[in-house]
């Protein structure tokens, strides 16, 4: 475990130079230790950092652009400098994607389903988050969380995950900010129009939880982070529930939503 802590410290230093493509939460506060039992810390020794969400004992959901070599997945972590007895580490056994082209990760299908090499055990600091059973509603209050940058562009990283609240916004608000964004995608637009709160470098792949439901995966957004009238883009999890459930059930040839 000492090696893990050393790697974590090196990772924080290396991430000082990361771009938002590996999107901490700006404008938030330290998460309550009991509110992120499903949150996975995903990284490798090269310094690439993402988050993920445990959806059952054997599967983690994250962003496709978080794919990396030598990936390690840590569960039950709160403070990177303090070890808990129930922390668990896994590596991917299999990875599943919906991508048809590299451009999909920008505008659509930025989703990766990971089967772990062995099931994790539920504990005081580890428990899965269910998939959504309803689509998100416009204006919903949503929770974001992660170990990413808490300042931008001069990035500072925290050893604990930060949490904050944002809202689901009309899709047109994101189209107005990001030129070339298609008229329809499987993306959620979410943020605070006045700025000051946002996901940022190191948060990619983490959950967007709206009214208690896992509705989005942190995908990408404008950099520097947390600027006014620059909401973030999140993969809409509800649209992929059939695909996810089919893969988990063993139907590895399941079709992604068009």
UniProtKB/Swiss-Prot annotation:
One of its GO terms (molecular function) is toxin activity. Residues 19-24 form a propeptide. Expressed by the venom gland. SUPFAM superfamilies: Trypsin-like serine proteases. Glycans are attached at residues 44, 79, 103, 121. This is Thrombin-like enzyme CPI-enzyme 2. Monomer. Residues 1-18 form the signal peptide. Keywords: Blood coagulation cascade activating toxin, Disulfide bond, Glycoprotein, Hemostasis impairing toxin, Hydrolase, Protease, Secreted, Serine protease, Signal, Toxin, Zymogen. It is an enzyme of class 3 (hydrolase). InterPro entries: Peptidase_S1_PA (IPR009003), Peptidase_S1_PA_chymotrypsin (IPR043504), Peptidase_S1A (IPR001314), Trypsin_dom (IPR001254), TRYPSIN_HIS (IPR018114), TRYPSIN_SER (IPR033116). Belongs to the peptidase S1 family. Snake venom subfamily. One of its GO terms (biological process) is proteolysis. Thrombin-like snake venom serine protease that cleaves fibrinogen beta (FGB) releasing fibrinopeptide B. Promotes capillary permeability-increasing activity through the release of peptides from the beta-chain of fibrinogen. Its EC number is 3.4.21.-. N-glycosylated. Disulfide bonds join 31-163, 50-66, 98-256, 142-210, 174-189, 200-225. Coiled coil: none annotated.
């Amino acid at each position: 475990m000492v090696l893990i802590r050393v790697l974590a410290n090196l990772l924080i230093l290396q991430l000082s130079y990361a771009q938002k493509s590996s999107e901490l939460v700006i404008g938030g506060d330290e998460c309550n230790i009991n509110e992120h039992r499903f949150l996975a810390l995903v990284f490798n020794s090269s310094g690439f950092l993402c988050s993920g969400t445990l959806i059952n004992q054997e599967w983690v959901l994250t962003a496709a652009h978080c794919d990396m070599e030598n990936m390690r997945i840590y569960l039950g972590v709160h403070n990177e400098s303090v070890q808990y007895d129930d922390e668990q580490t896994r590596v991917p056994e299999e990875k599943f994607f919906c991508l048809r082209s590299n451009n999909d990760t920008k505008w659509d299908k930025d989703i990766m389903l990971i089967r772990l090499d062995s099931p994790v055990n539920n504990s005081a600091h580890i428990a899965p988050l269910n998939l959504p059973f309803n689509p998100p509603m416009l204006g919903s209050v949503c929770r974001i969380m992660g170990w990413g940058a808490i300042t931008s562009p001069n990035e500072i990283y925290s050893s604990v995950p930060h949490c904050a609240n944002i809202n689901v916004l009309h899709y047109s608000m994101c189209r107005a900010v990001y030129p070339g964004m298609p008229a329809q995608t499987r993306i959620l637009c979410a943020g605070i129009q006045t700025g000051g709160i946002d996901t940022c470098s190191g948060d990619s792949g983490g959950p967007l939880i709206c009214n208690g439901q896992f509705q989005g995966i942190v995908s990408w957004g404008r950099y520097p982070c947390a600027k006014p009238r620059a909401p973030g883009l999140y993969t809409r999890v509800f649209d992929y529930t059939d695909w996810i459930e089919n893969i988990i059930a063993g139907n590895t040839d399941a079709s992604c939503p068009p």
